[in-house]
Amino acid sequence: MLDGPLFSEGPDSPRELQDEESGSCLWVQKSKLLVIEVKTISCHYSRRAASRQSMDIQASYWARGPQNRTCRLRPGSPEPPPRRPWASRVLQEATNWRAGPPAEVRAREQEKRKAASQEREAKETERKRRKAGGARRSPLGQPRPELRNALRAAQPTGFPVFSRPERFGQVGRAPRPSALPQGDPGVAWAGPWGGRRPGPPSYEAHLLLRGAAGTAPRRRWDRPPPYVAPPSYEGPHRTLGTKRGPELSRAPTSSAPVPATTRTEGGRTKKRLDPRIYRDVLGAWGLRQGRGLLGGAPGCAAARARPESCKGAVEKSSGLAAAGLNSGGDGHSQAKTTGPVTEVALSGSTISSPPRPVPRSRQHLRGSRKGKEGSEEMWLPTCWLSSPKKPPVRHSQTLPRPWAPGGTGWKESLGQREGTEHETLEVWKVTRRAHTLPRSSRGPAGREGIFVIDATCVVIKSQYVPTPRTQQRQLAPSGESCIVSDSLRQPKPCLEEEGKGAAANPSVCQKRLLSSRVLNPPSEGREFEAEGRQQGDSSLEERSSSGLGFPVGEVNPRDAPTHPGSPEHSTLGPAAPGCAGSVKGPEAAGVPRRAGGGWARTPGPYAGALREAVSRIRRHTAPDSDSDEAEDLSAHSGSSDGSDTDAPGASWRNERTLPAVGNTRPREGGKTAELGDSIGEILDVISQTEEGLVREDTRKTPQGKRE
């Protein structure tokens, strides 16, 4: 409906002005191009309105608002992009810039729908005004339209040309965009054109613009909102900020201190300048890669330094640096942190880098080769002093230095390290700026440590890794601390078999292992035997079997030591020594291993917890650490060493253990193979951890047993 009136009117008074622009055709085409029915009006008016910005007065008129915006935006380029957003900056316009006018258009359309009558009235009023004042205003506005018309007339070829003229207009009319944006939504749009050309708007602004564009329209409310692509990366993100302390400090430092070092590699010197640009313009992006990629020099320096730094350690550190961090410098800092190899690298790499403490990575890389000799002498001591701290100096700028925890302490670290490396201080002074200060200081100060947040891979790994002691503490329920090592070792093999001598113990160990591998039922039988001998032990056996996933027989060895006080324990004491040897290697090792693995930690008392854990694991659920479930589980686990810790850890550990546990015995047969495998694994590791674990278990098991 708008189109008809617009056309008639557009041709009427606008024709005079728009004929110059060859506006009528253009409007239609553009409206079609925009695929916005009413866009014809806005397009038509855009030219007209551009010429008659007096007409822009009618912000009330939705079309006019668009016209005004369009006209203003168009001169600025916002308007054309909506029509030809695809041409100049597809990404930018699609993401950021289209937001302005497209949002307006959508809002306008909605407004039309919402207040079609009002809009019509406004249109009529505007049309009348245009007709009456169109000629008058057009003369006033004509000059502007004439500019546009001149461009468009010169480019009457069509909107394609027109769109490009508008680009020109954007360039030539850049001032106009500012003027046009005055009250138009496009102002943020057009104005940002000028301001944003350096870079895309902040993502927040982008979302506001683009989201706002899409929010009002939301025609399909039943569907999720359209995906808002992040602003195109034509320029640095505003959100990144220009605070590239390390990079700035390094690059400027590179320029200042590097002259000698940097001169050696003139290209790099230039690149250092580029890195400065990267820091300032690209910010964190420039920094992280400024060292490795954007800077170009740092990465190359690192690569060269690695091969060139003849020191194997230096190469290693360089490799580490390059591998660990994009920039060799960062890598070196990390390498330094890494350790002795790092230190070697420090002497080699850092020595050269000290001359340019901030650009240390580059200096190290470049200076290590060329400035190395002189700088090494000078900086070798300094490097060594600062190198432990320096590694952070190379801090890979994962985050803007200001965010680094040590940012505030940069002065102190700078004073200390830079005292060591006066040049670093100088560099820092040169590079330190309000925004850069923390980071530049960080360069030298980073030596303390590196604050790196590596979010490249968002992997949340939550694992409860109980100390071997904790796990085994639960395993040895009744073992008093008094019988910790001796009773544990002695009775373990003999637990099941009190009467059996040391000779029987090896077989017992074997039997236990076999039973654990073969089936838990055999272990159950043994467990029952143990129970006959020691009710407490049987419970211990069950616990250990359930906790460790070992058959009770297997667990019994520990259970017996666990109950050193029991008569069986006394009997075991003498026989145990023999068993201790045999059991200790294969079985004691097996049991503690499981404990280390986290299985040993769930004794019979935790059977409920184990079952819960198994079910949860199968359901891929876990009690919330904050929830009462964890507490309940801990209580169930009743581990003296920290139920809260045990509960979660026990849960997942128990899941593994349960298969072999007496509680899980129905499944044990199926799990026997797993148990056998795990047992072999356990035996391997347990021999090492057995003694310490057993002692701990014995001490803490009594509590667990009591619980």
From Swiss-Prot:
It is found in: Cell projection, Dendritic spine membrane; Cytoplasm; Endoplasmic reticulum membrane; Perikaryon. Keywords: Cell membrane, Cell projection, Coiled coil, Cytoplasm, Endoplasmic reticulum, Membrane, Nucleus, Phosphoprotein, Postsynaptic cell membrane, Synapse. It is a peripheral membrane protein. Residues 359-369 have a biased composition (Basic residues). One of its GO terms (cellular component) is cell projection. Residues 340-434 are annotated as: Interaction with ACTN1. Residues 103-134 form a coiled coil. This is Dendrin. It comes from Rattus norvegicus.
